[in-house]
A protein has these predicted regions:
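Surface-exposed molecular-recognition determinants
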Residues: 1-160
Length: 160
């Protein structure tokens, strides 16, 4: 695990309206891997595949082409065969809190680069989400979730 991005959204950081993070992911081998994030609510990190509980960017060998797969747990995945290697993903994610208690959301924008034989393919990802059954204003934290063959660098670039 690459660590906790932020914990204490309802306590230590409750006065902040926007928290923005920049990240870069590199997959170091051709085996299946992933990198993404999870939410904390009710005092626990949500690890089950609940709707919008996690977002993943990954490299998999399950299909023969590059696709974006948005499924019931809000994972965003790059599927690839042995000739399509998604090696680099970069982007930002941000936590936004509005004036009302229910006006909170996480957004992300990312770009991926995949090499397929002699060509480079570029993919765009974006989305917004929260945790099913949990009001977004009660989300307490956000942390990274990644496999051992993914290298993940990140930095908080703004808090307001």
């Amino acid at each position: 695990e690459a660590g906790t991005i932020i914990d204490g959204l309802q306590t230590t950081y409750s006065d902040y309206k926007v928290i923005k993070v920049e990240f870069y992911i590199h997959f170091s081998s051709t085996s299946t891997g992933y990198a993404g994030f999870q939410f904390k609510a009710g005092g626990s990190w949500i690890t089950s595949p609940g709707y919008h509980s996690q977002c993943e960017y990954g490299r998999h060998h399950s299909q023969s082409n590059l696709t974006q797969d948005t499924n019931s747990n809000s994972s965003i995945t790059i599927n690839e065969d042995s000739n399509d290697r998604c090696e680099n993903i970069t982007g930002t994610l941000a936590w936004h809190r509005g004036p009302n208690s229910e006006d909170a959301m996480l957004t992300w924008d990312a770009k991926g680069m995949a090499y397929s034989g002699a060509n480079y393919d570029f993919l765009l990802f974006n989305g917004a989400g929260g945790e099913a059954g949990t009001r977004n204003n009660t989300i307490e934290g956000i942390r990274w979730k990644n496999s051992s063959n993914s290298n993940l660098w990140w930095k908080v670039i703004g808090m307001k």
